[in-house]
Amino acid sequence: MARARTLLRNKPYSPLMNTRFDSMGPEVVEDYFHKSLVWDIFPSFFNGAYMQDGEWVRVHYFQDPKFYNRDRHLFRQFIPVLRRLFDAGWQPVTRARSQPRQVRVERYGAGGEVLFALYNGSASPLDARITIEAESLDLTHTREATTLLAGAKVACRPDGKSLEVTVPLGAGKAEVVQLSR
C-alpha cells in the first residue's frame, strides 16, 4: 500500500478485494479498513469467484446483505474520514515523527486542513507521541487536536518550533488526527 500511495501521489486508489467473502470474518474486514486508512486507500470489494466441488461460485459482496449489513458501520465510520484525507491531499514529507517508532505516520494537507494518519502495527495498544515540525507547517499557535475516528480531543503541547500530540492507538488500529490552526 505504501508503494501504491507513493506512485499514485494524490490520485485515488482502490484495490479490488476478490476473495471468498464468507471466509472473511468481521475482524478481517475491520483490519482491512484500518490498514487502508493510513494510506487513504478506499477499501473495496470486487465480485468474488472461487472453485467449490469443481464448480465456480460467484459472490457479489454488495448484493448480499449478510456481508454489507455486517460491515455497514465500518463504511459509515471510515469513508467520511477517507474523503477528508483525499480532499486534503497526501504529502510525501510528513514533517512528523513518532514514538514509539513503529507507529506509521502519514500527513495529509499542505494548506488549510492538516491531518495526520497514524497506524499501530504492533500487537499491543500504545500511546503514540507524535512530534510535529509546527513552524514549517504554520502550526505554532495550534493548541487543539481531535481524533476523527474516535471523535475525541487529544493532548496537544507546543514545544518551541515543534508540537507534540499524544494519541492512544489500539493494537493493529489506525486513527486520524486533525490539527486546528
Put a short name on every predicted segment:
Residues 136-139, 148-150, 170-176:
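C-terminal, active-site-flanking charged/polar segments
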Residues 158-181:
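C-terminal beta-strand-rich structural cap/linker in extracellular carbohydrate-active enzymes
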Residues 143-164:
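Solvent-exposed beta-strand/loop surfaces of large extracellular or lumenal domains
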Residues 126-128, 141-143, 175:
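Short beta-strand/loop motifs in extracellular/secreted proteins, especially
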Residues 1-138:
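Active-site-proximal substrate-binding groove within the catalytic cores of carbohydrate-active enzymes
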Residues 73, 105-108, 144, 174, ...:
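Positively charged, low-complexity intrinsically disordered regions
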Residues 126-132, 154, 165-167:
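Generic detection of short hydrophobic beta-strand segments and adjacent strand-loop junctions
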